Every structure is written in C-alpha cells, then in structure tokens.
C-alpha cells in the first residue's frame, strides 16, 4: 500500500521526498533501504534525516529534512541554470553562503543550509565592511525584501545551536 501511495503522490506533483525514521541518527540502515525504494519509484530528490541532521530530536530532525526536500530541488535548478549561462566548467569557482556564515561549493549546497544564508551574508558583509574602518563593536541592521535582521558584533562571532525565529 505504501509503495502505491508513493507512486500516486509522485505522479500527481511531487518529485522530492523526505524520509525521517525515529532512530536513524543512530541506526540509518532503514532510511537507506527506504531511499532505494523511493528512488526506484522515480523521485528525483530524496532527503534523508540522518544526512540532514545528526540530532536525536526527531521532530527537529524531521523539520530540517522536510525543508531540505522542499528547497534542494529548487536550488539545484537555479544552480544548473546559473551554470548554463557561462562557457566552460566553472563549477569549482562558484560558492554559496550557508546559514552558518560559511561558504560552500555549489555542488555541496543544500536547501537546509540556505534558509538563513541571507541574514548570515548580511552579518559577514557588515563585519568585513567595519574591519575597513578598524571598528570591532558594531550593531547591524539588514533590511531586505522579506525580512529585517538586527545583530551585534563585539570583535568575535558568537555561535548557537538552539535558536528561535519568529517564535519557531
């Protein structure tokens, strides 16, 4: 029944699938087996929770995996279109800003790492710009088309694993 349901979903509109099993962060064999089944049905992108997040919290890992399944195909199409606009192989020369503020090669960029890439880019850009004036304590205000981010910097980056955005 599950395989028939997956075929119906895939034939209607979905080409991407998220697979989240409760204990896959410690034992991923079943997710790998499910991936083989889903790919055989014809899904073009399969996001596995054990790959998207190593945390034990099932719901958070599931949220991350679903976001990756939704966003990665869109990003992949964008990257393919971008490559097609250039002559020659430029794949090693294009990098994308990730949510953690780091850069990654376009071939490694994933949907889950793109969610906060804009705000991260604003922070990194502000810090680099302030360094030109030798300022090490700054408050940043980054207003874009869909969000506004306010942040501070006191000479070193702060990292967090747990955060809330808009109450979530």
Question: Where are the model-predicted features located?
Answer:
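N-terminally biased helix-coil "hinge/interface" segments that flank
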Residues: 1-168
